[in-house]
């Protein structure tokens, strides 16, 4: 197996028609028509300005860097073998190899993207060797910059910049004396007698390779995935850590679409993607292949056996053993947001099919800051850049807990977090302080039998800050100066914290510079409008708070996810308002319908009532490390 992807785009070739792809029969085996190929070419031209295609020169540079890294690994393993007095016959054939996974291995990486890599070594090479002698060897290379090891991570990794290309290297030691060049990591027998960290490290490569193995046409899959990933980023639903979907989950959804329409080209597959998943009957899982039991006693996703798996709202199951749900972070709110986006994507691609819109419309950014009347702004700050980097990572990883807590409030219909983070204006221009903000849009409802409604968010916010500070202290990461602040702002007050170009209704949207980390206008007045904002400083270990329920557990009783993939009602539903002529578009089976876009959004709109005021009472908190105040906050409708 080659570690480097082939990214050349050749003419699409129809796949040979087997009885079924994946876990069900295809919906349609129709081959593309001239209009479909023309729409695909227009899609490619629309994608180019977004930087989703890498130039050949840059691709060759990546290949050269990986070859150098691969040679370093082989050289290092030979040195380790000699130091451990292995026979010369073994040393000469000991091998060792760098494998790639993620977007680069899938062949859908963008300009300037990093590379996920895996160093595979034989049994006599220890993980400690990887983080000592191999780390030292990398440090001697002139091309290597920003070298750092994260040995205690859930998946231990060495991070570096090699000749200007960011690379994350994982490590796995196999129960083999030598590592052959033609090693296939999809072989389940390789998992025998491995520790859990090696299994986790292997998982990325195994899943990526399995996905490529299970799609009917790799070129069509890649182009479709490029389009869907760009769409997801433009629409702010690309973030596994915040409860949306990450790269591997989007890849599996696209792969399932390719299985259902094995001969379709990218323009058709993009449209079918929205059709399939706007109608998917969640929590039925998305599966690319039937789960297999290997009797290796590894935990696998199975709601029949594991009660916690029954609470997963949008399960997308990895195809490699041990099968896992890649979307366990999805909450009620994030699923609602994504389903609405699927439906809107279906409506737009339907317009494109009828020549009523261009592909560029699909990649227009939604108006997040115009969508809701009420917002919660989370602000994380630290005294130094290094502290800020660690602090922001921890806070961001816990935001989904706050979303899950807010969802349980009977008067909150939706807690929509924007995955983009924004630099916050400085509170004191004379002090060096590093600040980052996240914004959560709130959908609220007002009972009919009440004219005034008080929504107390104190417990939700305080529980969230408790969780963050507790983990920071327990992991010995906490430093004085690390703070979390939460503020409630109405839509018309967002300009106090966010620059105009972020708030304006932008149509054209580029993925370059999306995190906006270069913005920090110190002229913004953080204290403006403080009457209508709430500040919730750090919590302490002395505060007695109940445990938060995971964001994957909703307000309602969980529905048991069955171990079968459904094609929803795609084949059963009939045309309702508008009907597509099957002679005008290939890949549309005669018994298949494209549902008309709903006229009302899937997410409940914000209520008419505005927040009138915020009532606060303050009490002191005593803590050996911190002296802070706690505010109780109510939204008065």
From Swiss-Prot:
Keywords: ATP-binding, Magnesium, Manganese, Metal-binding, mRNA processing, Nucleotide-binding, Nucleus, RNA-binding, Transferase. Pfam families: PAP_central, PAP_NTPase, PAP_RNA-bind. Residues 1-10 have a biased composition (Low complexity). Its EC number is 2.7.7.19. CDD domains: NT_PAP_TUTase. ATP binds at residues 101-103, 110, 114-116, 168, 229, 238, 247-248. Its cofactor is Mg(2+); Mn(2+). It is found in: Nucleus. The record marks 154, 159, 329, 400, 525 as: Interaction with RNA. GO terms for biological process: mRNA processing; RNA 3'-end processing. Mg(2+) 2 binds at residues 114, 116, 168. It comes from the Eukaryota. Binds 2 magnesium ions. Also active with manganese. GO terms for cellular component: endoplasmic reticulum; nucleus. GO terms for molecular function: ATP binding; metal ion binding; poly(A) RNA polymerase activity; RNA binding. Testis specific. Mg(2+) 1 binds at residues 114, 116. Residues 1-23, 535-555 are annotated as: Disordered. It catalyses: RNA(n) + ATP = RNA(n)-3'-adenine ribonucleotide + diphosphate. It is an enzyme of class 2 (transferase). Belongs to the poly(A) polymerase family. Interacts with GSG1. This is Poly(A) polymerase beta. It comes from Homo sapiens.
């Amino acid at each position: 197996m080659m570690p480097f992807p082939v990214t050349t785009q050749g003419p699409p070739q129809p796949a040979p028609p087997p009885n079924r792809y994946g876990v069900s029969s295809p919906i349609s085996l129709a081959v593309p028509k001239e209009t479909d190929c023309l729409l695909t070419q227009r899609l490619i031209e629309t994608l180019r300005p977004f930087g989703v295609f890498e130039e050949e020169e840059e691709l060759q540079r990546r290949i050269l860097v990986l070859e150098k890294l691969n040679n370093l690994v082989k050289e290092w393993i030979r040195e380790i073998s000699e130091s451990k007095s292995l026979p010369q016959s073994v040393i000469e054939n000991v091998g060792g190899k760098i494998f790639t996974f993620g977007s680069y291995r899938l062949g859908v990486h963008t300009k300037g993207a990093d590379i996920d890599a895996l160093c595979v070594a034989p049994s006599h090479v220890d993980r400690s060797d990887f983080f000592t002698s191999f780390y030292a060897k990398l440090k001697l290379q002139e091309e290597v910059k920003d070298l750092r090891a994260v040995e205690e991570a859930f998946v231990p990794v060495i991070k570096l910049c090699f000749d200007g290309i960011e690379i994350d290297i994982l490590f796995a030691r196999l129960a083999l004396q030598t590592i052959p060049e033609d090693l296939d990591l999809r072989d389940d027998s390789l998992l025998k007698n491995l520790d859990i960290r090696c299994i986790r490290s292997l998982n990325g490569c195994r899943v990526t390779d399995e996905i490529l193995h299970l799609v009917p046409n790799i070129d069509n899959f890649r182009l479709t995935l490029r389009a869907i990933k760009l769409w997801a980023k433009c629409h702010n639903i690309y973030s596994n850590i915040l409860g949306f979907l990450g790269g591997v989950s989007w890849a599996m959804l696209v792969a399932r679409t390719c299985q259902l329409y094995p001969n379709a080209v990218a323009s058709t597959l993009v449209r079918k993607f929205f059709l399939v998943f706007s109608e998917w009957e969640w929590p039925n899982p998305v599966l690319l292949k039937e789960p297999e039991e290997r009797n290796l006693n590894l935990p696998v996703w199975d709601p029949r056996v594991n009660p916690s798996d029954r609470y997963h709202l949008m399960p997308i199951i990895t195809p490699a053993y041990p099968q896992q749900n890649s979307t366990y972070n999805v909450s009620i709110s994030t699923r609602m947001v994504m389903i609405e986006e699927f439906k809107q994507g279906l409506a737009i691609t339907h317009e494109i099919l009828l020549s009523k819109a261009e592909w560029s419309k699909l990649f227009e950014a939604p108006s997040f800051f115009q969508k809701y009347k009420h917002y919660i702004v989370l602000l994380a700050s630290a005294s130094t850049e290094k502290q800020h980097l660690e602090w922001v990572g921890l806070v961001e990883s816990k935001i989904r807990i706050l979303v899950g807590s807010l969802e349980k409030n009977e008067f909150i219909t939706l807690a929509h977090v924007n995955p983009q983070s924004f630099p916050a204006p400085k509170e004191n221009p004379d002090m060096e302080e590093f600040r980052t903000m996240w914004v959560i849009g709130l959908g609220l409802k007002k009972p009919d039998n009440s004219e005034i409604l008080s929504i107390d968010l104190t417990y939700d916010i305080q529980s969230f800050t408790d969780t963050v500070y507790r983990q920071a202290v327990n992991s010995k990461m906490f430093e004085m100066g690390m703070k979390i602040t939460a503020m409630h702002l109405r839509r018309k007050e967002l300009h106090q914290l966010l620059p105009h170009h972020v708030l304006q209704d932008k149509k054209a949207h580029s993925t370059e510079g999306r995190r906006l980390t270069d913005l920090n206008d110190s002229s913004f007045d953080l204290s403006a409008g403080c009457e209508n904002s709430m500040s919730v400083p750090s919590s302490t270990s002395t505060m007695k708070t109940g445990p938060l329920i995971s964001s994957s557990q909703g307000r309602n009783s969980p529905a048991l996810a069955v171990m079968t993939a459904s094609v929803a009602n795609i084949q059963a539903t009939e045309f309702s308002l508008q009907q597509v002529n099957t002679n005008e578009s290939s890949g549309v089976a005669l018994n298949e319908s494209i549902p008309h876009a709903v006229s009302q959004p899937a997410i409940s709109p914000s209520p008419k009532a505005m927040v009138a005021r915020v009532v606060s009472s303050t009490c002191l908190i005593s803590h050996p490390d911190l002296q802070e105040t706690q505010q109780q906050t109510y939204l008065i409708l």
